[in-house]
Amino acid sequence: MGLDLPNDNLIRGPLPEAHLDRLVDAVNARVDRGEPKVMLLTGASRGIGHATAKLFSEAGWRIISCARQPFDGERCPWEAGNDDHFQVDLGDHRMLPRAITEVKKRLAGAPLHALVNNAGVSPKTPTGDRMTSLTTSTDTWMRVFHLNLVAPILLAQGLFDELRAASGSIVNVTSIAGSRVHPFAGSAYATSKAALASLTRELAHDYAPHGIRVNAIAPGEIRTDMLSPDAEARVVASIPLRRVGTPDEVAKVIFFLCSDAASYVTGAEVPINGGQHL
C-alpha cells in the first residue's frame, strides 16, 4: 500500500510510565507465546536493505519494511513480506507522522525489537558525476537531508515507546563518505552521513537509560546498484583486502548489532570497508 496523504502532525512524546509497564507486560506475554522479534527496515527493496531483510527473515524475525518501490515477491520470498511492506517516500518529512502511524498499526501493540535506518539517496549530475558543494542546489540539499538524516530522527522519536518496551536496538547506516571526501559520493550525501554518525552518538547517549542501544555501520564500497562496474574497478586498488564488499557481509554486521551478542555495544560506528579507512 502507499501513503500518499501529507500529514504535518507533530511526533508525540514518550508514553507515561504506567502505559509503558503495560507494554512491557505485553512483551513478556508475547515472548512466552514464542512470537517472533520484529524489525522495521527502511529502504528494503534492494542492495543492503534487501540482504538485511533476507537474513533477518531466515533467522525467524518478522520484517516490517518500507520503501518508495512496491514489494517484489519474486526477489523477496520471505514470509508475509507483501503484507508487512508499505510504500512511502521518507524524503518527504510530511509523510513521517503517517508512516509512524502505519508502523504502529501493523505492530498492533507488539514491541519493536529493531529499527534499521537504511534508506538513503546519493544524487549525481546528469552525466553521473558527484555533486559538489558548489554545484548542489538547495532543493537537493534539503531532499538528501530529509531522507538521510531527518527520517531516522523522527522514526526513532515516534517509535520510542515500542523500542523501549523491547529493550530494542537502532542501527543507522552511515558511510565511509561521512569521514572523508569521496570520489563518487556527493557533498550533500557525505555531510548527511557525517551528521547521521553524530546523531547515532546523541541517540545512544539519550536512549541508553531507557534500555535502547543505538549504533551505526559505515559501509565502504559495496557491490550494489550505487556502484558501477567502472567505479568498482577504480577503487579496488585503494582497499587493503583488494575487493569490494557484498550486501550479505553488511547485513551480518547489522544482525550482530541487533542481537544479544551486542548487548553491551552502543554508540559505536562500525566500519565495513575492507580496511579502506586505514
Swiss-Prot record:
Gene Ontology terms describing biological process: nitrogen fixation
Ligand binding (substrate): 175
GO molecular function, one term: oxidoreductase activity, acting on the CH-OH group of donors, NAD or NADP as acceptor
Domain of life per record: Bacteria
PROSITE patterns assigned to the protein according to its UniProt record, in alphabetical order: ADH_SHORT (PS00061)
Catalytic residues in the record: 189 (proton acceptor)
Keywords: Nitrogen fixation, Oxidoreductase
Protein known as: Protein FixR
Gene name of the record: fixR
